[in-house]
Structure formats: structure tokens, C-alpha cells
Amino acid sequence: MSLVDISYVSDSVIEWKPYKKGDDIVKRFSTEDWHKIACDVDSEEILQELFENHPDKIQGYVLYEVKNNTPIAFVYILKEYCRIKTVSYHGGGWGKSPRLTLLYMRGTILLIERLLKEGFKVRTYCNKDNHNAYRFMQGLGFVRYRTTEERIYQWINLRRLYNSNIYNYIFKRRLL
């Protein structure tokens, strides 16, 4: 049984596909960047094993640009044990161009929107020193709800997503 079906999260620009063996995600990131996404996973084999052994708790997805079917980002959704329909969202893109960043933002918005519309509470967290992740999620409308010595925890709802700077920049200006 899968955690959530996102097979229909796509538009004419991007498409999310379930992570599968052979996607070779880990090597697309620098070691430093990868450990910001999944600090305890050091190889593709460990990542595959994690998804295979816990399909009801964690799922991975790869974001593709529709035009040329090129992978541009990876995320995983982790079911939080304390709540039935609460998930934690983590990931990143490996493209460094402004266009690839906009595509990743667009894909992230569509995926988070789908999760929220399916009735999931969506949260995330990042290490305090991961300023890029914190600013990105804040730009999407995430709000801090807890801080520890090491991490910042955030949540989002549909209203905050639709009112966010990034959502308005991409969808109201019809970029891409």
C-alpha cells in the first residue's frame, strides 16, 4: 500500500513520477547537498532499500520537465508517526540555472497543493544552517512552528500556499 498517489500531479510543463530503481538520484547531488536532504542515506542502494522496506511510511518522487523528459529534482514524503494524515516533505533540485529553479518551484507547489487537497497536513524541517531550504519553504508560505538547537520545523496550508510570493510569481505571471 502506498502512502499517497501523486501519479496525476503534472501539467504541461512538469510531471512527478515515483522514484524507481535505476533513477540514480544520490549521485546527482554533491555529498554536502545530499546530506541536507537525507543525512543518514549514503548510497543509492540504501535509498532504494529504504523505499522498498517502508512503502507505507516513505515515498520518493522524481520531477521531470515534460518537454524533454529530463529529471530535475527529487523529493521524498515521510509519514509522521504521530498523526494519520500528516506528512513531512523533503527534497531538492540539482539544476543550478534560474529556469530549472523555477521548474522545481512549480513542481513543488503542485505536489504540495495535491497533498493538501487530499487532506494531508504538510510539514517540513531543515537544519538551522540550511538557509536556502528555509528561505525556499518560507517563500512557498511555510510557517515556523518549532525550533530546536539543530532544526527549524514548518507547516503550510492551502491559503498560505496560494498567497505565497513564489506561487504568485510563477502562476499569476504565467511563467514557463
Question: Where does each model-flagged region fall?
Answer:
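Short amphipathic alpha-helix that is part of the acyltransferase structural core
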Residues: S2-E45
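A short, internal acetyl-CoA/4′-phosphopantetheine-binding micro-motif in the GNAT/acyltransferase core
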Residues: S88-L103
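Conserved catalytic-core motifs of GNAT/GCN5-like acyltransferases
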Residues: Y125, V143-N157
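Conserved acetyl-CoA-binding loop-helix of GNAT-fold acetyltransferases
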Residues: R99-L115, R135, G139
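Conserved beta-strand-loop-alpha-helix junction that forms the acyl-donor binding cleft
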Residues: R123-R135
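A structural microfeature
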Residues: P71-A73, G141, R146
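Conserved beta-strand in the GNAT
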Residues: V62, N69-S88
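A short helix-loop-beta-strand connector motif used in the catalytic cores of GNAT acetyltransferases and
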Residues: E49-Y64, A73
